[in-house]
Amino acid sequence: MQGIGEVFTRHDDLTALTSGDTPRANNEAMTKIYHLAAENDLPVMLHSNITSKREKNPLYLKEVEEPLRNHPHTRFIWAHAGTSAEIHRHQTQLPFLLPTLTRMLEAYPNLFIDLSWSMLTPYLLDEQGKPRAEWLALVEKYPERFMLGSDVVGRFNKLGQEMHSYKPFLDALPEAVARKVARDNFLAILPRNTEKSAAPR
């Protein structure tokens, strides 16, 4: 085993279809998973929306911050930085996302950001497909904390096309940083002792 996830916690329509308690990253039931991950040096990838379709503030941020704070020895990859296509159908862009991520990356060294799916546009690239300077600056400030992803599900023939979409953004980064974001950061977050993580419990 190389990691846990993508674990769907708060997730647009999937949350609405869930009976009982809303799935949350800070639910007590997740604690054992986070401990297991830390004990076995496994990263945990969480899908946890930062807000709802309508609220113009990071309404659900606490649900991600609590595990980050309470489990400092667990490495968390925040899928799509808490954004989603459904949120963007109602709010084109979240103006609080960049400052929120800036603060969180400084506060939580165990936080890593997945740039897949809803992150490419409208965040990394503008409407003309040009890299946004403020996002380039954030990635350059934390060059080991971002990684690409495809979020391709069931249509793997489109994988190359999806990954190629990031080329304008990667080309605008210093070469060493681009290599980290495109490949090295993901490899670095995987278990350092693969024999231990693969051993049966």
Label each residue range with its predicted role.
Residues 1-11:
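Active-site-adjacent structural elements in enzyme catalytic domains
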Residues 4, 37, 80, 113, ...:
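Conserved, mostly hydrophobic/aromatic
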Residues 11, 19-147:
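Catalytic pocket-lining loop regions of alpha/beta-barrel enzymes
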Residues 14:
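Glycine/Thr-rich phosphate-binding loops of Rossmann-like dinucleotide-binding domains
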Residues 141-147, 152-201:
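Mid-to-C-terminal alpha-helical segments outside catalytic/metal-binding sites
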